[in-house]
Amino acid sequence: MSFHVNNKAVGDPLNSEDWRIKGYNPLTPPNLLQSEIPQTAKSRDTVFKAREEVIAIFQNKDAQKRLLVVIGPCSIHDPLAALEYCDRLMKLKEKYQDDLLIVMRSYLEKPRTTIGWKGLINDPDIDNSFKINKGLRISRQLFADLTEKGMPLASEMLDTISPQFLADMFSVGVIGARTTESQLHRELASGLSFPVGFKNGTDGTLDVAIDAIDSAKYPHHFLSVTKPGVVAIVGTIGNHDCFIILRGGRKGTNYDAKSIKEAREKLESEGMNPRLMIDCSHGNSEKNHMNQPKVVHAVAEQIEAGETAVIGVMIESNLKAGTQKVPKEGKAGLEYGMSITDACIDWKTTETVLAELAGAVAKRRTLLGQNGTY
């Protein structure tokens, strides 16, 4: 990677700072990119409507008592495949609109345990060229196109700068298991304009996520940038639309009835809204994408039996099943419609699990309506 400003001190430990920094490139200001790729009225309506619907579900005010379903690729590396996936998902979104609020999982940045491809923003050409300005431009155009089609989006929040370029396109945010304990990410969540889910820690415990929700509802101050790109101190008012996502962990899965009951009671004891999502992948699938339908089935059984604590699920899905490594020839050699990060279920399986979830929600609504619970 070439740099606009090369650091002459690189490799010289006698310098007191920056000797491990190779150089610097200017970053496109957020407001410039947003003016080049503006949000249309249709996109804005898509985003705002879904934000309101997600909050209504979280607060148990949704008239249809629907289930929030965040579903889509583990990460997006091919905008064309993402658009095709969206077109297919839109048909199911409309088909199950009375029972499911479908939001497309649209992750552009990937936290890595060690090293690896960090996402479409960081390395859009998947060749270690790290053309981040290009990645931001591609990502914003993709999100503008997806929301213009009427598809609301959910994405993971990894830093305090990229949301300034893209957050106007999001209806749901997620803080991952690795970053839920991070003070900076809790501060970030406190200022986001949409609901945010915090995943339980990688060890499977809930305490860090509960602490995160509690922290995010208060005002904070942290470092970020303004829309013109000037480094600034950001002051927030707090975000009361945060919730827990059960994703399993090193100690095992936590999508079973006992785990959900314990999580609900824990939230109630802390004076919090006892409503949560289930991540059907990651620890709950034991990192095997073929287990996701099993998790969905177990959750669907609880929903149709009347469980109301579960407000949503997260599913990793793509056009084709599995995952692939980037070949020597780079992105040109990739198989279309298949993940290059976590393995996903295929489209046929996606149709099956969404149908099962919609049926479970309908049964729950009938059951609790008869009991006068709703």
Swiss-Prot record:
Pathway: Mycotoxin biosynthesis. It is an enzyme of class 2 (transferase). Keywords: Amino-acid biosynthesis, Aromatic amino acid biosynthesis, Transferase, Virulence. GO terms for molecular function: 3-deoxy-7-phosphoheptulonate synthase activity. It catalyses: D-erythrose 4-phosphate + phosphoenolpyruvate + H2O = 7-phospho-2-dehydro-3-deoxy-D-arabino-heptonate + phosphate. GO terms for biological process: amino acid biosynthetic process; aromatic amino acid family biosynthetic process. Nonribosomal peptide synthetase; part of the gene clusters that mediate the biosynthesis of AM-toxins, host-selective toxins (HSTs) causing Alternaria blotch on apple, a worldwide distributed disease. AM-toxins are cyclic depsipeptides containing the 3 residues 2-hydroxy-isovaleric acid (2-HIV), dehydroalanine, L-alanine which are common for all 3 AM-toxins I to III. The fourth precursor is L-alpha-amino-methoxyphenyl-valeric acid (L-Amv) for AM-toxin I, L-alpha-amino-phenyl-valeric acid (L-Apv) for AM-toxin II, and L-alpha-amino-hydroxyphenyl-valeric acid (L-Ahv) for AM-toxin III. Gene clusters encoding host-selective toxins (HSTs) are localized on conditionally dispensable chromosomes (CDCs), also called supernumerary chromosomes, where they are present in multiple copies. The CDCs are not essential for saprophytic growth but controls host-selective pathogenicity. This is Phospho-2-dehydro-3-deoxyheptonate aldolase AMT16. It comes from Alternaria alternata (Alternaria rot fungus). The lineage of its organism: Eukaryota, Fungi, Dikarya, Ascomycota, Pezizomycotina.
